[in-house]
Every structure is written in structure tokens, then in C-alpha cells.
From Swiss-Prot:
Keywords: Activator, DNA-binding, Homeobox, Nucleus, Transcription, Transcription regulation. It comes from Notamacropus eugenii. GO terms for molecular function: DNA binding. Residues 1-56 are annotated as: Disordered. This is POU domain, class 2, transcription factor 1. GO terms for cellular component: nucleus. Phosphorylated by PRKDC.
Length: 75
């Protein structure tokens, strides 16, 4: 759980740096969505070996959500 929280703390920070002037609300929503997905994956994965893979997938999905948020902002 601690490792997942540390990993989850990194993507929102990068999204905030990537989209500072556009609008902070979409980045916050993206971070909330990523945190929700992380909690679901953490609950689903009970094996310690599968949890690192799950966190990696969460990282990818979080970046995807950030990209989608950026696309929505651009539109």
C-alpha cells in the first residue's frame, strides 16, 4: 500500500507540471480517477508478485487519463 501511494503521488505531480496554466481542476479529477483505479487494483491483487505489475498498469492508465484530460482541455 505504501509503495502504491508513493507511485501514485508521482503522476499527479507530473500532470500538474505539464498542465499548470491550462486549468488545475482537470488535473485534480485525473488524480482522483487514478487514485480510485489504484485502490481497486490494490484490492483485486492479493499476491505480492502481482501487485508491482498492477501498479505498473495503474501508472499507464493514469498517464492515459491525463492524456485524455489534456485532449478534453484542448477541445
Amino acid at each position: 500500500n505504501n509503495t502504491a501511494t508513493v507511485i501514485s503521488a508521482a503522476p499527479p505531480a507530473s500532470s500538474a507540471v505539464t498542465l499548470p496554466s491550462m486549468s488545475p481542476s482537470p488535473s485534480a479529477s485525473a488524480s482522483e480517477a487514478s487514485s480510485a483505479s489504484e485502490t481497486s487494483t490494490t484490492q483485486t491483487t492479493s499476491t505480492p508478485l502481482s501487485s508491482p505489475l498492477g501498479t505498473g498498469q495503474v501508472m499507464v492508465t493514469a498517464s492515459g487519463l491525463q492524456t485524455a484530460a489534456a485532449a478534453l482541455q484542448g477541445a
